Amino acid sequence: VDCIKKKTDVVNKITKDLNLNNVEVTWANVKNINKNYDFIVSRAVAKYNKIKSLCSNKFLNKNLNDKKNGFILLKGDNAKAEFYKCKEHHEFSIHDRIKLDYYKTKKIFYVPNPYIHMDN
């Protein structure tokens, strides 16, 4: 979901070129979306609390993957403080896998659905 059509057009092209059939790209404002998702993926557009508030009630209740439904967020190295109140979160260094200077300060933060406790 993105409100900028140019971005959604690019992502649609990438998903088509890679033959990714389990990806849905929507050109809209997240506030106007009435669907639910396994994962919400974001790239450093806002602080975690803002993203969390925009995405309340946007997760599917049933987990269909190895990881629990939740947020997957690309953030800079200084974003760790955004997650100090999270009951559970995991941080991954991108540079550990992609040895480009650009990724030295980039992290992926995974936060399981913070709205409900899910055991399945």
Segments from the language model and where they lie:
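Short, well-ordered coil/turn elements that cap or connect secondary structure elements
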Residues: 20, 66, 87-89
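Conserved beta-strand signature within the Rossmann-like core of class I S-adenosyl-L-methionine
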Residues: 62-81
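A short SAM/SAH-binding and catalytic strip from SAM-dependent methyltransferases
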Residues: 31, 37-61, 73
